[in-house]
Every structure is written in structure tokens, then in C-alpha cells.
Amino acid sequence: LGNIDTLTSQSSLFTFQKYINEKGDSLNYRQLLSDYDNNSKYPLVIFLHGAGERGNDNEAQLKWGVKNFTSDNIMKIHPSIVLAPQCPKNMSWGNFSEDDMSLLPSPTKPMQLLIELVKKTINTMPVDVNRVYITGLSMGGIGTFDAISRYPDLFAAAVPVCGGGDVTKANIIAKIPIWVFHGVRDTTLSAKLSQNMINALIKEGAEPGFTLYPEVGHFSWIAAYSDPMMMEWLYRQHK
């Protein structure tokens, strides 16, 4: 029971929010704030959930990964602003061809709204614009590659977990610090998708991090988000 209580109290640290733009389009999200004062600037972390957590309850997106940002260690040593948006059912973060992972011309509606929300947050909260980070798992890992490929100037670092991306966009994202995680035994999204991105990035002169878990299937996010080295690395990155 103690564990369930802990998880519930971790969730309650995320306030319920809704972004609505001028057209009336909306995106549900949860927001985590460490203790902060307006005289300081704080890193902004965007977390993109996977396909199973889509919906409109503004709750399911906290199921995996993002609650690790509520640990005392992170909140005290690396106070930050964390946004965890929820993608509606039957939509996705990334817009790409299923055949070859090539990026399609326009972002999805949820991605468009997310970028609007990020820009609004930067304008209205004490965000360090040189420390905007994005991470996500599965559908959110693909979304992470999608976001940095479309908006490379926005992000200081990215951590795509069991995702994949468009190898032809490697030149656009080569200067962004990236650490990729994947399970070798993943049958939902092949680890080759991550490997292909890593190879393409290295060809462009980048030095991405790549952690492959030999015995892990699709759930590589459990290990990735509880890796203190990954967290320390993420918060060290800045433009």
C-alpha cells in the first residue's frame, strides 16, 4: 500500500491545466513546479507519454516515467517546470510515414498545440530558454524526434525512449544533445528505429548517447527514467 500511496501523492504534485488557443482548440496537461521564485530562471521539461495513455482524463499520461521528476533529489537539486500534456485518443504526437518513418510536412494538431503551450509557458513563467528539454516514450519517443526535427531551435536536449525518427532530418538535429534508450527485445517498436537514428546522427558528426538494454522489451522507459545518470546529464545541457 505504501507504494500506491507514494504514487498517488506524486501525481497530486502535478496541477491540472488546460491550454486553449485563440481558435478554441485545447490540450490537457499537468504541470509540476518545484519551489521557485520569479527572480530565478528554471529549466522546462516536456514529457510525451505513449499511445496507451491517450485520452481526455488528464491523468493517464502520468502513468509512466514522468513521476520520476517528483523525486526529492530532482526537485531539490534541479528545480524545474515540467509539462506533461495528454494526447487525445486516435491522435498522435508525431506525423510521419508508417513505411519509412519520414516526417510528413505538417505537425499533428496535438504537437502544434504543445508547441504553442511551450511558447506561452516561456513567455509567462520564469523559464530559462537555454534549458528547454523534451523527452518521451514509445509514441512519445517518436514525438520527441518529431518535435526536435520541426523546431530544432527550441530545444537544448532530447531523450527519446523506445521511439524512432526520420533519418533524413539528422543534419537538422545534429547539434542538439540527444540520449536515446531502447530495449533490444522490443517487438512493438524495433530497436533498429533508434539504431538508424543514431547511425544517421553520427554520420552528421553528432555524438549522441545510446543505451540499449539487451534483456528488455518495450518497457525500456522503466529503466531509462529511473537512471540518475540520465537525469544528471539532462539537467547539465544548455544551449
Role assignments for model-derived ranges:
Residues 1-44, 80, 110, 135, ...:
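A domain-start/cap signature at the N-terminus of enzymes
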Residues 35-40, 94-138:
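Gly/Ser-rich "nucleophile elbow"/oxyanion-hole loop immediately N-terminal to the catalytic nucleophile
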Residues 48-50, 182:
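The conserved beta1-alpha1 loop
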Residues 51-111:
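Active-site machinery of serine-nucleophile hydrolases
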Residues 63-73, 162-171, 192, 196:
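Alpha-helical scaffolding within the catalytic cores
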Residues 78-80, 173-178:
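Short, proline-enriched alpha-helix->beta-strand connector loops that line the catalytic pocket
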Residues 119-174:
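Primarily recognizes the serine-hydrolase "nucleophile elbow" in alpha/beta-hydrolase
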Residues 161, 168, 177-239:
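C-terminal catalytic histidine-bearing segment of alpha/beta-hydrolase fold enzymes
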